[in-house]
């Protein structure tokens, strides 16, 4: 009797999980992220869906469509609605400090390890999005995806990061 109850409960949890995975894209704005967003950049930042209605493929070393989908695939999932990031607790209670990615922050000089680092250019921001490499050659932390985005998509995201700075 106990085994049958556990089996029924297990199947019920499985069904709830599958229903959740299938319906979440529609809740956040359609299966293609097509809710009302004022710009392509806002849509990508908020949902992860690019100009063709698909989530851009992640590059090796990042997440994206693979295991990372369990953690989310949109910038907002880690960097928050305002782009300021902050402390994020992930699965297994692991916490990371997520950086502020507003344009004003990325393009301003800052102190790092006692040295002043120059602000990033638009092409350096694009490179970090695509390859996960900072202008100084250091790799971004592993949770940060490396996205195979079109020039239009990257430009739209950078423009949206500028909007977050206002």
Predicted regions and their residues:
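Short sequence/structural segments immediately N-terminal
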Residues: 4-5, 34-38, 70-72, 156
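Gly/Gly-Pro-rich "capping" loops immediately C-terminal to redox-active cysteine motifs
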Residues: 57-122, 143-149
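Extended surface/linker regions that mediate inter-domain or inter-protein docking
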Residues: 20-21, 25, 156-160
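C-terminal capping alpha-helices of c-type cytochrome domains
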Residues: 40, 119-136, 140-166
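Electrostatic cytochrome c docking/interface patches
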Residues: 25-69
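Short loop/beta submotifs within extracellular cysteine-rich repeat domains
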Residues: 51-53, 86, 107-109, 135-137, ...
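N-terminal Sec-pathway targeting helices
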Residues: 1-15
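Detector for the c-type heme attachment site
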Residues: 46-49, 77-84, 162-163
């Amino acid at each position: 009797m106990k085994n049958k109850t556990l089996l029924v409960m297990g199947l019920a949890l499985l069904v709830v999980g599958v229903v959740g995975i299938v319906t979440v894209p529609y809740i956040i704005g359609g299966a293609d992220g097509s809710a009302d967003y004022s710009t392509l950049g806002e849509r990508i930042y908020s949902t992860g869906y690019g100009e063709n209605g698909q989530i851009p493929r992640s590059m090796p070393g990042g997440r994206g469509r693979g295991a990372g989908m369990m953690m989310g695939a949109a910038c907002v999932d880690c960097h928050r609605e305002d782009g300021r990031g902050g402390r994020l607790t992930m699965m297994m209670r692991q916490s990371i400090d997520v950086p502020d990615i507003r344009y004003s922050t990325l393009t301003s000089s800052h102190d790092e390890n006692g040295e002043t680092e120059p602000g990033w250019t638009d092409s350096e921001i694009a490179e970090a999005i695509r390859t996960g490499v900072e202008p100084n050659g250091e790799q971004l932390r592993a949770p940060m995806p490396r996205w195979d985005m079109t020039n239009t998509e990257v430009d739209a995201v950078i423009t949206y990061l500028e909007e977050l700075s206002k």
